[in-house]
Amino acid sequence: MKKKLFFIILLFLLVNTSSPTFSITFTSIDNLSKEKNNKTIDDNIQQKKKENPSNQIIEEINTVAKEKESVNNPLNKLVLVNKEQGLPSEFIPEDLVVPNIPFAFAGDHPKKKIRIVAAKALEKLFAKAKEDNIELVGVSGYRSFNRQKEIFDYNARLKGVEAANQYSAKPGHSEHQTGLAMDVSSSAVNYDLVEEFGETEEGRWLSKMAPEYGFIIRYPKGKENITGYQYEPWHLRYVGVEHAKKIAYNDSTLEDYLYS
């Protein structure tokens, strides 16, 4: 009987005792369990990062992908216009302005205009040219669908369609319609748009400095099979500083940059 009573009392004490020692011990065990679980989760996350690109890389890829998706958006600075991809005949940028730069001709003319984002960058480029004693003038900026049709038809009648295709864009396929392009020249070549401009001091300076202000030489030498057009050292296209520098650094073209 005493033995039975002893066990009953012992059991009562074990169940009801609120000893701090027991409480701390159980809490510690619980914390250790949580730490172990957290460590396991962290280990799993680290393993996932090893197996897959980091979130930062994924975000960068997504950012570039979104920009590249915009090649079909006429208002995007990376819009791609070439022989395969064109613009709607009715597309006219709404933010065309005349940049504050010298031109090869006087008077008010639509071809003096470009989009405001490109105009601001062009003004800075020309200001730097003046600072470096480099003479540059604007020759031809924005060109409407209808105006491009007139130019192409004239060249086709003069030299034939095949020849015209090498240096003149068909209507809807001219970068000038984007409002992001400007042809430039200098007195060294009598303000003409000729390949010799690329060999002048002004042409070499332009090729080097244009990317610093967001422009690329859109049709570089040796890339005719990619761009579809002959070398045009005078043809500037605005794409933004970051993109322009990358394209220039890789000696690339807009086509390669967008689809590589």
Where are these regions (language model features)?
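Extracytoplasmic cell-surface/polysaccharide-interacting catalytic and binding patches
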Residues: 19-141, 145-260
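Sec-dependent N-terminal signal peptides of Gram-positive bacterial secreted proteins and lipoproteins
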Residues: 1-26
